[in-house]
Amino acid sequence: MIISVSGTPGAGKTTVSKLLSERLGYEYVSVKELALSRGIGERVSDEIEIDVDELARVVREEFSGRNVVLDGHLSHFVPADVVIILRAHPRLIAERLKARGYSKKKLAENVEAELVDVILVEALEENERVLEVDTTGKSPEEVVEEILTLLKSGTKKRVGIVDWSEEYDKVVQYLMLGDD
């Protein structure tokens, strides 16, 4: 089974993916490292640009029939049996990305993406089985337990569990309104 764990940067993907793979006894694969090692991703300033079509091809060829947890911001674009979309309050995303040294522009882009469900919408366009999990206020262990419960129950789709639209006023300070 291929499980993809995606979400806005700062939602907790890597921590949760590693713990989930450990709990399931699955192989852990970083999409970023996979792309760089296969020459389908390149560093451009402080980002990595990945050819998503090539990434999907590599995943299909190398991981089909294997038990793998794919960790990465773009993992919802590759063939997977189930896609887990991790969500976190936009303010929490902002705090985490600020601590990582993200530029104001990149921080704003990611806070806005979380506010308006960008990753969730992309995942739903690409995949049949999408499970949305809110990580806000939960330990990584609690998040993994929730994911395991959803997987064991056979839940096919769980979306719409978060709505950050009411949170706009609380995170507007992180957005670059009117800035170029």
Curated annotation (Swiss-Prot):
Which top EC class applies here? Answer: transferase
Q: Which reaction does it catalyse?
A: AMP + ATP = 2 ADP; ATP + H2O = ADP + phosphate + H(+)
A matching Pfam family: AAA_18
Q: Name one GO molecular function term.
A: adenylate kinase activity
Q: Which SUPFAM superfamilies match?
A: P-loop containing nucleoside triphosphate hydrolases
Q: What is its EC number?
A: 2.7.4.3
Q: Where does ATP bind?
A: G10, G12, K13, T14, T15, R100, K138
Q: Where is this region: LID?
A: 99-109
Q: Where is this region: NMP?
A: 30-50
Q: Give the GO terms filed under biological process for this record.
A: ribosomal small subunit biogenesis; rRNA processing
Say yes or no: keyword Nucleotide-binding present. yes
Q: Which UniProt keywords apply?
A: ATP-binding, Kinase, Nucleotide-binding, Ribosome biogenesis, rRNA processing, Transferase
InterPro entries from the UniProt entry = Adenyl_kinase_AK6, P-loop_NTPase
Q: Which family does it belong to?
A: Belongs to the adenylate kinase family. AK6 subfamily.
Q: What's the subunit arrangement here?
A: Interacts with uS11. Not a structural component of 40S pre-ribosomes, but transiently interacts with them by binding to uS11.
Q: What does this protein do?
A: Broad-specificity nucleoside monophosphate (NMP) kinase that catalyzes the reversible transfer of the terminal phosphate group between nucleoside triphosphates and monophosphates. Also has ATPase activity. Involved in the late maturation steps of the 30S ribosomal particles, specifically 16S rRNA maturation. While NMP activity is not required for ribosome maturation, ATPase activity is. Associates transiently with small ribosomal subunit protein uS11. ATP hydrolysis breaks the interaction with uS11.
Q: What name does UniProt use for this protein?
A: Putative adenylate kinase
Taxonomy, top ranks, is: Archaea, Methanobacteriati, Methanobacteriota, Thermococci, Thermococcales
